[in-house]
Each structure stands twice: as C-alpha cells, then as structure tokens.
Amino acid sequence: MDDNQLGASSPEEGLTVAVTEIERSAAQLGWDRASTVYALVPTGELLELDELPADMRDQLESTWDHSPHTLTAVIQEDLPGTDLEETLAQLGWPESVLGAAVCTERVMVPPEVQDSAPEDPQEAVEYFANHPDRDEVRIVTGVLRSGESWCAVRTRSHDEDDEVAQGMNLVPGLVDALLATFAPAQARDVPAAGGCGCGSGGGGCGCGSGGCGC
C-alpha cells in the first residue's frame, strides 16, 4: 500500500497528489519494471475498516491530514489479463473505490521514426526498441470515478523530479481506458490502454521530453 498524504483541498488536488506520489515511488524503485494498477481510496474511509492491518493503520494515522480528499493508493495484485490493455478491460471497482491509477513504461521515438516503422505490429515493436533515437518513458495516469484525470510522464533520459511533465490529459488513451473501468459492465468499450501510439507491447510514443504530444 502506498500512502500519499501531502494534504488536499479538493478532489482534483487529491488526485494530483496521489499520481505524483505514485510516480516518485516508482522512480525510487528504478526502471524496467512491470505495469502496476492501483485503487484510489479516501484515507479516512480506509481508517474506518476494522480489518486494516495495525501497521498500516499506524502509518496512515500518523500522516493523514484529515482531509476527505486525501487518497491512499492501494496496489492491486493477482489481476486478470496478460497485458495492461486486457487487464483494464476486465476491471471493475466497488463503490468504495473513488479512483484508479496505472504506472507503466513505454518506448518513445521521434515522430519521423514512427512514420518509417514497419507496418507489421511485432516488427514495429522491435524496430522501436532497437532504434538509436529511442527513449523510455514512465507514465502514471490516475482518474476519479467522477471523471477527473491527472498524468505524470518521466523520460529515462531526463530522470529528475523537476523534469516530470504533468497534466490532465497527457495520455488520453490511458485516461479513457481507466475511466472505462468505472462504467457499468454492459456499457464498457475500453479503448487501447497505450494511448499516443504506446501499445501494450511497447510501441512508439509521440511524447516529447516536455510532455506527451498525444
């Protein structure tokens, strides 16, 4: 469980803080890690659970600012699906979950490299992965059930906290895929989770170092 307790005066700020803390925690762990999915739950509601482990309760109580908008990111394990897109297509959340977030890595290449890529998807993945102009990005995207979104994008070549690009819709495909997990099951039509040309297999991404131009 990752707690992100920096204080929040609104739902939007609570989401921004949660995404920022997930991204920084991921940065501390380093690169070349598997995608992770989080449930975003109001910290105050977590503390009301009798079954909350004592060590987690102590940690949350010592850092919570008592804001109803402060969220705790709870990592999800044993998820369905073999890749991120398939996993998100099968996810649904109980009402107690206010939002969701994903942390994933992708290969980034310049637009001209994307234009010259092979048409075969698998060949394109290999082409991007081995191209000398490639870079890698770590994308953290979070959404709230009510529709708000926030994204953080860090490139491996500019691996500093002050170089992380942030915005509401930097990776629209991933935002849409996360929002779809809150739709009624019969109404779901989950978009490709990669967004901006980032397929779940690690395809090219049109993200510049200052943000994601998708």
Functional labels for PLM-detected ranges:
Residues 111-214:
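Glycine-rich, aromatic-bearing surface loops/beta-hairpins
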Residues 17, 34, 83:
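Short, well-structured alpha-helical interface segments that form or flank functional binding sites
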Residues 11-23:
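Short linear interaction motifs
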Residues 61-119, 126, 135-138:
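Short, intrinsically disordered low-complexity segments
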Residues 22-78:
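N-terminal interaction modules that seed assembly of large macromolecular complexes
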Residues 25, 90-94, 181:
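Conserved short hydrophobic interaction patches
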Residues 2-10, 56-75, 181-182, 186-188:
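Solvent-exposed interaction surfaces and binding hotspots enriched for charged
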